[in-house]
């Protein structure tokens, strides 16, 4: 392809406003590089010329950083810088030859340095913002599917560029910076993040602030969640709201359309240890909500979300076995269920059964389903596990579960989860079956309630038999 001629922008060694020819030539190149055939035939000399213009224009930005009064004179330089970045950005699209040529000219280092200068300026100018965005887009494109370029971008950009841009007020800059981070990360570079946890935390914050942006979400699902070491190190540093965000993404990964792979399972077993330990240690935080009903206690919300994660993990047969034998987990779940059941019956609070729906955002809405999820988790942990079935009985959990079956708008599907738990508690467990049958005979379990749940007690000689009505499907 024939490149438009670009005359020099210096006369007699004195900096002058950018010649209109330079800008027009760059714009022409940018348009040409939208076509694949033009990208594939571009001579290396073009990229050297673009780099020369970029370097010369950078001098004006450096001057403005040293002398803020010069900012008002940046317009022509910013126009050239923006068009240089657009030109280079387009040249890199699905063209490894151009990516390599541009990288080998050390354009990446110049671009990163310039982007960092933009952050230093801290002035509100649309032209500066546009140049900033285009610079990040170029860095993302030059690194896309090119490991050599990714390495160079990482060397120049980590950690300063990510620290500077992930918390930028402009959501497009955050998105483009996240794209660069996503593109450049690999298993080795994850270790760098472990030593710079603030960057990882900034990604969580970016997802919180901009949930519509796919890049922060993809960084967390495709990189962070594949590193149990990073997740564990980061979890202790996160705010409670950030923990809720991370746990929500973990749930999304577990229940997503794509089934967890064998590698995912081994990683999530490590996550399960963190989640279970955190729940066992912190589950009583949820009780703060009984004394401070008007306060959205963030620690309590973390506990609620930890329970949600455990419910989804124990619904996965490959994760279930590990959690069924996790020390202290069943005991804690029964303990919390007993306390909130007692508190809910003794006084009016957010754990009391309700027959009226709550508005979204109310603290009652935040705790919706907590009690029924405790029972769901008990049912999961008892699935084909006699040791846990017996443990629930020993902890007096069976009467507690049966007494929790009242309709409660705060706990949708409560009856279904009670039925599910009772079935798993009694499957191939004659001792638990006898226990419930005797409760019914002694009036401690309502026969009509048991029938509604799909169970009935029959007398055979001097023995009581608990029978299940298989016509009622599990939840």
Curated annotation (Swiss-Prot):
It comes from the Eukaryota. One of its GO terms (biological process) is neuron projection development. The modification Phosphoserine is found at residues 12, 77, 430. InterPro entries: ARM-like, ARM-type_fold, Ataxin-10/CTR86_families, Ataxin-10_domain. GO terms for molecular function: enzyme binding; identical protein binding. Coiled coil: none annotated. Ubiquitous distribution. Markedly increased expression in testis, adrenals, and brain. Gene3D superfamilies: Leucine-rich Repeat Variant. It is found in: Cytoplasm; Cytoplasm, Perinuclear region; Midbody; Cytoplasm, Cytoskeleton, Cilium basal body. Keywords: Cell cycle, Cell division, Cell projection, Cytoplasm, Cytoskeleton, Methylation, Phosphoprotein, Ubl conjugation. Pfam families: Atx10homo_assoc. Polyubiquitinated. SUPFAM superfamilies: ARM repeat (SSF48371). One of its GO terms (cellular component) is cytosol. The modification Omega-N-methylarginine is found at residue 10. The modification Phosphothreonine is found at residue 82. May play a role in the regulation of cytokinesis. May play a role in signaling by stimulating protein glycosylation. Induces neuritogenesis by activating the Ras-MAP kinase pathway and is necessary for the survival of cerebellar neurons. Does not appear to play a major role in ciliogenesis. Homooligomer. Interacts with GNB2. Interacts with IQCB1. Interacts with OGT. Belongs to the ataxin-10 family. This is Ataxin-10. It comes from Rattus norvegicus. The gene is Atxn10.
